[in-house]
Structures are given as C-alpha cells and as structure tokens.
Amino acid sequence: MTNLVRWLFSTNHKDIGTLYFIFGAIAGVMGTCFSVLIRMELARPGDQILGGNHQLYNVLITAHAFLMIFFMVMPAMIGGFGNWFVPILIGAPDMAFPRLNNISFWLLPPSLLLLLSSALVEVGSGTGWTVYPPLSGITSHSGGAVDLAIFSLHLSGVSSILGSINFITTIFNMRGPGMTMHRLPLFVWSVLVTAFLLLLSLPVLAGAITMLLTDRNFNTTFFDPAGGGDPILYQHLFWFFGHPEVYILILPGFGIISHIVSTFSRKPVFGYLGMVYAMISIGVLGFLVWAHHMFTVGLDVDTRAYFTAATMIIAVPTGIKIFSWIATMWGGSIQYKTPMLFAVGFIFLFTIGGLTGIVLANSGLDIALHDTYYVVAHFHYVLSMGAVFALFAGFYYWVGKIFGRTYPETLGQIHFWITFFGVNLTFFPMHFLGLSGMPRRIPDYPDAYAGWNALSSFGSYISVVGIRRFFVVVAITSSSGKNKRCAESPWAVEQNPTTLEWLVQSPPAFHTFGELPAIKETKS
C-alpha cells in the first residue's frame, strides 16, 4: 500500500520523472508497433495485411503520430529528463509546484486511453495527426472517434501547459545561490525555451480543436464554407501550434547533446552564450514560419516569398548550434562511449534532416514535394533520428545517475549500431520515393516504387531489433547484482564537474540536497 501511495500521490520530482519515463516507454512501444504495421502494409505493392482497408491504414498513421509525439517524445524529454534533472542542475530542492507536477503526469494516462478508445469507436479517427477539416468534419467522420481524439489532445495539452508553468517558475525562482541565468546548464536553458513555446502555442491548438468540436457537434461553421467558414483558417491555427511543436520536440534534445558533447570531448561547450541565444532565436522564429506547411493551399505569392525566406533564416541559429558542437569536439580528447555515439549520430543525421528542410522551404519545390514521401523522410530524419537519438543519448548519459548502476557498454554500442543502420535503411530510400512522386497516407502504390519500399520496410524490422536490444540494456541495468554500482561521476568529470548532478550520489537521495549548494565557479 505504501508503495502504491508513493507512486500515485508522489510530489517528488525524481519519482514523477521516473513515471514519465515508464509512460513514454509504454507509449513508444505501442507507437513502434503501429509503425511496423504501416511498413508491413507498404512492404510490397497491393494489399498486404490490412485487406484493402484504407481507413484503417490512416487510423494507424494517426495513432502512430499521436503516440510518438504526445505520449513518447514529449513525456520522456520534458517530463522525464526535465523533471529528473532540471531541479538537480539548478540546485533546487524540487520543482516549484510539486503537486501540480503530479497532476501534470496523471492527466496523461487518461489522455492515452481516450486516444486508444478513439481507434476502437466506429471506423476510428483516420484524419492524420493534423486533423484537417473537412475530412475530420461530421460528414466524413461520423461517430465519436474524432471527438475522442480531440478530448485526448485537450488532456495532453493541459498536462503540457501545467508542466511548462512549473518549469518556468522553477527555473526563474528556484536557482541555487550563485546560479545566475548565464551560468545555467544548456539543458536547463533548452527546457526553459521549450516551456515558453508550449505555453504560447498550445492554447492556439486548443482553440482550433474546440472550434472543430463545435463544428462537428453543435452545427457551428468555423471551418465550413457553406456557413461562411474557411477550412484554411483551421490550417493556420493548427500550424501556428504545429510548427513550434516540432521545436518543442527537438530543443530539449539540443540541450542533452550539448552536455554529452562537452563531457566526452573533455572541453566546455564552444560558444555557450551563442548556444543560448541560438535556442532563443529558434524559439522566436518558430512562431513566424507556420505557413510553410501550407504552400499548396493557394497562398499569395508575396506570402509564399516571406515564409520561404523566414524558414531559411531558422537554419542560421540551427547551424550555429551544429557548428558549435563540432567546434566543441575539435581538438578535444574524445571518448566514443555509447552516449557520445548517439550524440555524433544525432549531429550527422539531424544535419541531413535540416538540409532536406531547406529544400522543402522553397515554395516552388515544395509544391512538387508536398505530401510525398520526401516530407516523411525529412521529418523522420529530424524526429526519428534527432529527438529519439537524443533520448537514447540522454538515457545512456544519465542512466547511472538514475538507477545508481552502470549500463553494459558493449550492449549499448550494439544497440547504437543496429538502430543507426536500421533507421537509415528505413528513411533514406523515402527521399527517392518522394522525388519520384509517391504520395503519403496511401496504403497501395504502383509497382515502380516496390524496390525502395521493400528496402525501407526491411530497415524498420532492423530498427525493432535495435529497440529490443535497448530494453535488454534497461533490464540488465535496472536489475541488481549483474553490474557494478555507479560512481557519483561515472564519466570521470570529478576534477572539473561543470554541472551539479555529478556532485550528488548515484542515485540521488530522495531529497537531493541536504542544504542548498552555493555556485561560485564562473563559466570559462
């Protein structure tokens, strides 16, 4: 009973962070299962496993997207690593609002249940994660499926807003003595910028899907031209949230990668202030480029010119970050442990994803490539090999601190190489499919596309083997006896620890700091 009470009513940031990790792992496995079903259907031309049920295919795609974005990456990155390490890194005893932290987590399981139940009601919600009307309207999706998906989004949105309020308050008000803003670790900065993005963008999504809900159920016509509405308005509202959302997914990863590159190159991060301002710039610019998702809806030519230019400008702060990571490694004494492998893999693959993003920023090119597999390849390079590689990197980097035990290094490296090979084999051929004009969200295709699709599907099976390796690593690390206890500072940064988490025991005490740490060292 006491154990149940501890986990249900916990107000401890580490316990809640652990709950987020467990939740993210469960949702991630479910999302992976959906993605494998998608790739099995696309493994060869014709109907493979879904018996020609195109609606079911789109339900799988929608569920895969929602699970991976709202129930895997965000809970693990912001809820998991954020809750676990932001208070420790700034020298705070806990989060500012511990009970708010508890409900932020417990809103997510009901939200997940609503999403899964939407797939089981009538024909499911086959709208894609964008939920565009008129496809998501009551004429095209009668029944309760889309409404359940909307309520699911509302709940996870409220969870994220409450969490972001908590992080902003904690980082501004609960830093230890001497921890000025310009001494904040980069991961804390990344969570702060992410929290602001969430706070500003999610209410817009909430407004859009609430309008959609009333259109469906109460006969309003916000998005129905028959009553003077406009479905393009929904697209503007959705993407005003949706574009900052992709930066919400990747920014905490930037912070994690900065820590890892610095630690394993044995050097402080190159251009700390530049890194901070680059993240802030990405956050601001992220709100000014949303219509690049809408080049094909008939925007004015001047509007398209602006959004093309603005989108390309976002590449500048992103490039600053990438070159700063490379400069940090330059001349460093690099150790290729598992976290560093994932970090280098992240930098390499995220750069490829960024370059295809520059291609898609051109409105003229995008008109040809929009809604083809080129776009799928682009955002999976950014997310499936950006955000997810950052998650794995952070896991291997901090797992000793979380469990108090070291992970098996060889198995970790095997996990990296299998996953690296698998995801590249899955997503690189999609560029060729997209350039050949293969459209997204369609479960069948002409025979001409068969070769690359077969390769892509094979790659996804390899990725699953890699993920299975990962869970083997988790099982071995978390079980006692098979591996040695983790030192306070497993990466040998005792001589010059730049961040506070390496000064506390592994795992940290239930209350991390007996007294507040005073931060005296200036940043070199």
Curated annotation (Swiss-Prot):
Molecular function in Gene Ontology: cytochrome-c oxidase activity; heme binding; metal ion binding
Subcellular location: Mitochondrion inner membrane
Binding sites annotated in the UniProt record for Ca(2+): E41, G46, P443
Official protein name in the record: Cytochrome c oxidase subunit 1
Recorded topology in the membrane: Multi-pass membrane protein
GO cellular component entries: mitochondrial inner membrane; mitochondrion; respiratory chain complex IV
UniProt keyword Mitochondrion present: yes
